[in-house]
Amino acid sequence: MRFINPKTDYAFKKIFGSSESKDILISFLNALIYDGNPTIEYLEIINPNLPPRVQGLKDTYLDVKAQLDDGTFVIIEMQVLNVQSFGKRVVFNAAKTYAFQLQSGEGYRMLKPVIALTLTDFEMFVNREQLISHFVYREKDDGYPYPDNEIELVFVELPKFTKELHELETLTDKWIYFIKYARSLTEIPENMDDIPELHRAFGIANQADLTPTELEDLERREMFIYDQQGAIALGIEQGREQGLEQGLEQGLEQGLEQGERQATRAIARNLLDRLDDEAIAATTGLSVEEVRELR
């Protein structure tokens, strides 16, 4: 038995965002947002459609959206690549979801809270040890919570999860282990099989139940991710080398700053054959015009 990689956009959406995934998503959100407590009892998946088949692999991310029984909107995103301005994009998507709720003539009292749950396959907060981080509005000096604290950002940094299979204790542990390691498993672990929603998630992720076309599509998506990771790593290395060389001539600080710019442009150049201009701009933080100048 082999399982598809939940960290790819198609697999993540298939497992958590399809029309038959409600119970799975409820268990998953309770585990990651509410520390395993059964806070969520019901939800509606807002966009229960799978992403289109790969056409040039231009999509850089995909999210799942749901509305809880109390009206709260939840945006769930799996992010594999540490692209420039990613943190700003998370804030933008949460704010946009909050602001775009109102129709013409509706008052602010109609607004519902928004939770943005983001899983990253990289360390987003390098100097922070916590695996799961919750960010909300609070007073700067004494931490007093803002009364209408209706936007919450929740991050799960997968590299910080280091538990082995035999060390899994909580529902949170087991769901994170599933996301991080399902691709390398050959059977459903005994200590995870007793949770019905996890068992169903493994069933959806079973490669044997996919068509050859779906498997080919998933393989291309995984290769695309690996190519992007390689291109970004190479661009960073090339930019640093160029920056250090210039640092010896111009002064270290100025050279390193120039190196960062060179790294960004090197990353963009390495992506020219793989992505369109808009996707490269979203990945690197360059403007579309700057990307076009590199072609």
Q: Model-derived features: where do they sit?
A:
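Elongated, amphipathic alpha-helical interaction scaffolds
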Residues: M1-R295
